[in-house]
Amino acid sequence: MGMRMMFTVFLLVVLATTVVSFTSRRGPKSRRGEPVPTTVINYGECCKDPSCWVKVKDFQCPGASPPN
């Protein structure tokens, strides 16, 4: 392999590892094997609890109005 070909392969490897690291959903903690916490909102349960409406401002429960 020539020098130009080796440089091209090197750039492709660097690009591939960069793309993989940015597209994975892991945070910096996952490198140590710790899970990254996520928040999942159950909208059915949230509709039953008016105090939950304050946390979820962009969701409107059907037939309900958020507190003022």
Swiss-Prot record:
Q: Kindly indicate where the leader peptide sits in this chain.
A: 1-21
> Is Signal among the key words of this record?
yes
This protein's GO CC annotations = extracellular region
Predominant location: secreted
Q: Which UniProt keywords apply?
A: Disulfide bond, Secreted, Signal
* Disulphide bridges: 46-52, 47-61
Tissue spec. comment: Expressed by the venom duct.
Q: Where in the cell is it found?
A: Secreted
- Any keyword ATP-binding? no
- The superkingdom of the source organism is Eukaryota
Q: Which residues form the propeptide?
A: 22-44
User: What family classification does the UniProt entry report for this protein?
Assistant: Belongs to the conotoxin A superfamily.
Question: What's said on domains?
Answer: The cysteine framework is I (CC-C-C). Alpha4/8 pattern.
Name the job this protein performs.
Answer: Does not show activity on all the human nAChR subtypes studied.
Any additional notes? Both the globular (with C1-C3; C2-C4 disulfide pattern) and ribbon (C1-C4; C2-C3) isomers shows no activity on muscle-type alpha-1-beta-1-delta-epsilon/CHRNA1-CHRNB1-CHRND-CHRNE nAChRs, alpha-3-beta-2/CHRNA3-CHRNB2, alpha-3-beta-4/CHRNA3-CHRNB4, alpha-4-beta-2/CHRNA4-CHRNB2, alpha-7/CHRNA7, and alpha-9-alpha-10/CHRNA9-CHRNA10.
Q: What is this protein called?
A: Conotoxin G1.9
